[in-house]
UniProtKB/Swiss-Prot annotation:
Primary gene name: prfC
This protein's name: Peptide chain release factor 3
Domain tr-type G residue range list: 9-278
Primary role: Increases the formation of ribosomal termination complexes and stimulates activities of RF-1 and RF-2. It binds guanine nucleotides and has strong preference for UGA stop codons. It may interact directly with the ribosome. The stimulation of RF-1 and RF-2 is significantly reduced by GTP and GDP, but not by GMP.
Biological process according to GO: regulation of translational termination
Keyword presence, Protein biosynthesis: yes
Binding of GTP, residues: 18-25, 86-90, 140-143
Taxonomic placement: Bacteria, Pseudomonadati, Pseudomonadota, Gammaproteobacteria, Lysobacterales
Keywords, alphabetical: Cytoplasm, GTP-binding, Nucleotide-binding, Protein biosynthesis
GO cellular component, one term: cytosol
């Protein structure tokens, strides 16, 4: 067996998705803790505490207590290599989350036991369904009162359209929480506040009939549990690996992330059943992970991960072959070889130089403006991975500068921050305005904050009369030039130099489309070609 085949089989690359405040970042911490990647989980609860969540590493995130950029973390567990991509839970950062989901092989969905399925979870599930991504579910905050577990499973099935297969089942909830029972092994894990719940620090009974269990949880609770399990095992599906890998069934676990409870069974099950790196579609062929030659694509760019070095790092998912430090790779878009020196692996903002990487791994490439989101790297073959789009923004603001002498820094800041993909930067053809587009208001706050802290620029963002944007293309260059002349007041270029129509109203956009039927208007732009024709 080749090294690439063996190492690919060891990889598990996944993302955690949830509605804001479902406890995703806390669970991320605990997975790292159980994986031995960190010694002490960050105090996510007290945001004023010195210890901040390991995966919320940017200054703004630490101050606000929300994840606004995706972190990448790698750790070994039970002979496997786990690549965990933490995603922003805040709704305004959906595009970043969408692109992260193109880089993983499976996902873990976190649901708040009291709130059930929430709006953001529904949207993220829709994205996962587009790619039939296998999903496991962790129902969190079991130490608080919440919905009836049977009703929760019914809600997940009804709202998200995916079959539930419970793997662990709660014994009580809130103040009555006594533990969980594993439906596959019949083991009972007791809940004892203050414990770490590692294998060495858990009270585990081998079955519901084990001596001493009734004394620990109470005769009545044990009798109720037997009754409930009879009902649930008769009414719910058994775990089916084929259905799970096809994205049609979700194994469900219950626990309390903040108390470390229920995390170990989840991680053990994940390592055993989650898929290793899968094949990937390109514009020309399917790439298998076990191919010997390196391929990979960039799904994220992060500016100023280290403010002292003013750096930009491109996050590349390795899709096939083996990456070695200092190797040259073919950058398909520019048709040039780039030396991938000083590539990095991550533990949130802690970074280490990487000697080698295999399919499923995410490496950081130092980027001096040559690499964009969606770019493909190979060992010479011309191909382009598909499905990594930019979306048309829904909100637009004009950047206003307090100090006109800082214009150059402002332009540089807006360009670099837009490369990360959470905002988009437009320059109208007929004015000197600097227009920023986003999908949520929070992004303008984030950009203003980062401009000040990372670029030394005080900028405000004022409303501008733009309702929506569309990328415009035409195969006939003469027709495109005529369209450009007639509509120059509504046209701009984005950070990549692509032509964009900025419509003041929906009616204006409709009229423009009717008057120029040979011009294609796109609501999303995918690297190498556009998708999503209006």
């Amino acid at each position: 067996m080749s090294e690439v085949v063996a190492e690919t089989a060891r990889r598990r690359t996944f993302a955690i998705i949830s509605h804001p405040d479902a406890g995703k970042t806390t669970l991320t911490e605990k997975l790292l803790l159980f994986g031995g990647a960190i010694q002490m989980a960050g105090s996510v609860k007290s945001r004023k505490a010195v210890r901040h969540a390991t995966s919320d590493w940017m200054t703004l995130e630490k101050e606000r207590g929300i994840s606004v950029t995706s972190s990448v973390m790698q750790f070994p567990y039970e002979g496997k290599i786990i690549n965990l991509l933490d995603t922003p839970g805040h709704a305004d950062f959906g595009e970043d989350t969408y692109r992260v989901l193109t880089a993983v092989d499976s996902a873990l969905m976190v649901i708040d036991v009291a709130k059930g399925v929430e709006e953001r979870t529904i949207k993220l599930m829709e994205v996962c369904r587009l790619r039939d991504t296998p999903i496991m579910t962790f129902i969190n905050k079991l130490d608080r009162e919440g919905k009836n577990p049977i009703e929760l499973l019914d809600e997940v099935e009804r709202v998200l359209g995916i079959q539930c297969a419970p793997v662990t089942w709660p014994i009580g909830m809130g103040k009555r929480l006594r533990g969980v029972v594993n439906l596959l092994t019949n083991e009972v894990h007791l809940y004892e506040p203050g414990r770490n719940f590692t294998r060495q620090d858990s009270t585990i009974f081998t079955s519901l009939e084990a001596p001493g269990l009734a004394e620990r949880i109470g005769e009545q609770m044990l009798a109720d549990l037997h009754e409930e399990l009879e009902l649930i095992q008769g009414a719910s599906a058994c775990f089916d690996p084929t259905e799970y890998l096809g994205g049609r069934q979700t194994p469900v676990f219950f626990g309390s992330g903040v108390n470390n409870f229920g995390v170990q069974p989840l991680l053990d099950f994940f390592v055993e059943h989650a898929p290793s790196p899968q094949q990937r579609d390109t514009t020309s062929r399917v790439v298998l992970p076990t191919e010997e030659k390196l391929t990979g694509f960039v799904f994220k760019i992060q500016a100023n991960m280290d403010p002292q070095h003013r750096d930009r790092v491109a996050f590349m998912r390795v899709c096939s072959g083996r990456f070695t430090a200092g190797m040259k790779a073919f950058h398909v878009r520019s048709s040039k070889d780039l030396k991938l020196a000083n590539a990095l692996t991550f533990m949130a903002s802690d970074r280490e130089s990487v000697a080698e990487a295999f399919p499923g791994d995410v490496i950081g490439i130092h980027n001096h403006g040559r690499v964009s989101i969606g770019d493909t790297f190979t060992e010479g073959e011309v191909l382009s991975f598909t499905g990594i789009p930019s979306f048309a923004p829904e909100l637009f603001r004009r950047a206003c500068l307090g100090d006109p002498l800082k214009l150059k820094q402002l332009q540089k800041g807006l360009t670099q921050l837009s490369e990360e993909g959470a905002t988009q930067f437009f320059r109208p053809l007929m004015s000197n305005d600097l227009i920023l587009g986003a999908v949520g208001m929070l992004q303008f706050d984030v950009v203003a904050y980062r401009l000040k802290n990372e670029y030394g620029v005080d900028a405000a963002f004022e409303p501008v009369s733009i309702t929506t944007a569309r990328w415009v293309y035409c195969d006939n260059s003469k027709t495109l030039e005529e369209f450009r002349e007639k509509n120059v007041t509504n046209l701009a270029v984005d950070a990549s130099g692509e032509l964009v129509y900025l419509a003041p109203t929906r009616v204006n956009l409709q009229l423009a489309q009717e008057r120029a039927p040979e011009i294609h208007f796109f609501a999303t732009r995918e690297h190498a070609y556009a998708v999503g024709v209006d």
